[in-house]
Amino acid sequence: MRRERREGTPVGLAELERRAARGRDDDGRDRNALIVCDRLVRIFTADGVEVQALQGLDLLVERGELTAIVGASGSGKSTLLNILAGLDTPSAGAATVAGFDLVTMDAAARLRYRREVVGFVWQQAARNLLPYLTAAQNVALPMRLGGGRIPRRRRAERVRELLDLLGVGHCHDRVPERMSGGERQRAAIAVALANAPALILADEPTGELDSRAAEEVFTALRTVNERLGTTVLIVTHDASVASAVRRTVAIRDGRTSSEVLRRAALDEHGDEVVVAQEYVTVDRAGRLQLPAGFAERLSIRDRARVALQPDHITVHRDDSRDA
């Protein structure tokens, strides 16, 4: 399931758009899983103490999805993103992206993976762009480092196409300090797309931006997803971003705890509205996490009563201690 590439020939934007158009099902989701995480574990040791950042996390993301990952600080979001980016290795479990086994791949495969399969956008613009290069030079750099013999003219055309696609063609010859924060982040997305990756990972890409610039950056990520068919995974605390994607996955205590799926529907007046439905995640052992707000509101602690009904399960506070 590895991404096909011709030596020295980057995948053009027009070809990516054609693939995106024919690769999606009627509901907009692609047929094949791109990311598969199965009981993923990551343990860190600090001052002789083991900390389990991921505690058996399960996640499946299909090709062509635009998904947000949310969760409190320390929930495991950044750890997951670093593993998917090839910057860290799981302690146990399984994780594959586009056919690459992130647990067992060697150094050469990891380098190829990071160059060809995944693109990363950091929150801090300084980590995305080299300050002494123009936007065009920053975008061209990954192509030059990728090892393919791309003709200079074709490379220049692709740089221009990417910058124009993301609305920063006017920044072609500007260095980062001459761009606004939003322009820098959109240029960073172009850099991440340089080698036509299957997956874009964005870690709080709007975290340092005002609301207008944040909207422009999110629109750019949506454009990449819709026009090119690139799978996009965004870690965010921005509620406006999390609520604007079709799927939002929440992580709590190192596990996926719940998801919100959104779809368009017509109300009683015939107007289009977005309908959101929240689901809890059930792991292979049959465990689920109640949404924190539910447990707090009903004062559910330590244990709860459950009862099987014909078509659902009820969960009740344990009142036996009050008797």
Task: State the predicted function of each range.
Residues 93-101:
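Conserved ABC transporter NBD signature motif
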Residues 48-51, 102-119, 152:
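ABC ATPase NBD coupling module
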Residues 200-203:
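Catalytic Walker B motif of ABC-type/P-loop ATPase nucleotide-binding domains
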Residues 115, 174-177, 194-195:
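Conserved signature/switch motifs of ABC ATPase nucleotide-binding domains
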Residues 132-141:
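Short coil-to-helix segment of the ABC ATPase nucleotide-binding domain corresponding to the Q-loop/switch region
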Residues 85:
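Helix-to-loop junction immediately C-terminal to a conserved catalytic motif
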Residues 100-101, 140, 147, 152-171:
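Conserved ABC ATPase "signature" region
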Residues 211-213:
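Helix N-cap at the start of a conserved alpha-helix in ABC-type nucleotide-binding domains
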